[in-house]
Amino acid sequence: MGSTQSKHIASAIRNTDMNSDPYEWMHIRSIFPDDYFKLLKSIPLEEVQHMLVNDFNDIDVMSAVCEKFVDAPKNGDIIQSIYAFWQTHGAGYTLKPHEDGPSRIFTFTIYLPDNDDYPEAGTAVYEVNEETREYKTVGMMPYLMNSAMLICPFNKRTWHGVNMLTKPIKRDSIVLVFANHEWAEGKVHYADWKAGVNVNHVI
């Protein structure tokens, strides 16, 4: 049986509409129970990442994610690990258009703002001209309390990033990944401060 928060996460994912332009992406509101989000906000991010790995390491959560994505891998592909890492950024930060590596089956970014004053600090969805490398913002997964962005980098180009932060913001977030490789502490980039666990979920 999953925890209360895991059940809530799975339900929130299933009840969120999918966007499909220019690739599949979701912005999930109320991803946690309100009291649990308040708890996450009250403790250090280093601890939050471990808690979220446990919460998302749930069969119903993983199944809910796989069900939503047409572009998700199928037919015996395996989620072999879940890992998470925290980030804090401020004014002047930007993350240029990029694609996640092929080892990432699904990528969440859990937003942990103090308020809803800076929605533009969320994850931008880009359309990229592969020849000229010019890009434009065609969607936004806004930086709002108790929400998360979700993409499936595995089978499709998923250009995304963060537009330049120009306001005095403290942008806290947790990146949480479902990966197709085993979790081996000390052998993964930034493993000294990531939280991770091996799983075996056949898609």
How should these model regions be labeled?
Residues 85-100, 153:
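Conserved short histidine dyad/triad with adjacent acidic residue
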Residues 1-21, 188-203:
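Fe(II)/2-oxoglutarate
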Residues 102-104, 112-203:
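Catalytic core of Fe(II)/2-oxoglutarate
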Residues 49-60, 64, 93-95, 134-138, ...:
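Active-site rim elements
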Residues 4-8, 12-75:
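Non-heme Fe(II)/2-oxoglutarate
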Residues 75-78, 97-101, 115:
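Short, conserved, surface-exposed binding loops centered on an aromatic residue
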